[in-house]
């Protein structure tokens, strides 16, 4: 079991929780990434992590309502359009709740790139961003790598899941090189939902 693999009662330190903050399939979120999660790994107790997540989530929901309620502000809508706009709202909610981004609270991003990828044309389409911008937004592999690299430089992202089409091993390697050049060696990149290095029965 996972509990046994992590050391059971003898574990020195348990992993931080990953707490869902934004679901890309929810209408109110209006983002293209599959999921954004809070990683409160700078808070020592599980109770403290859960409390922080609740406080942040409440402020984040209010910020989303305000963003989605804006009408007749095309420039502002473009500014808020990308998934980076949702990350900015989440970062602001963390700070307003009294926590420190990059010290107490980090983010995990499940880009879910496979659902954005159009195999025939070889580009990634961003429908939510396109709607908010009023024009089609699509990115090549190189453009998506640059986009993800920029986001990890601007926000305290500690995990990137499915950042590119899963069969694009060359692209994953290029992304890893980009992050290494930024000294972002603390970021874990998962090209699938379960790392292959873990024992097969870990998640049973």
Describe each model-derived feature in a short phrase.
Residues 1, 23-25, 110, 160:
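Buried hydrophobic positions in well-ordered alpha/beta secondary-structure cores of metabolic enzymes
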Residues 73, 77-78, 84-204:
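Catalytic core of soluble alpha/beta enzymes
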Residues 1-2, 6, 10, 40, ...:
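Structural signal for hydrophobic packing residues in well-ordered secondary-structure cores
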Residues 5-76:
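Mobile "lid/hinge" segments at catalytic clefts and subdomain interfaces of large enzymes
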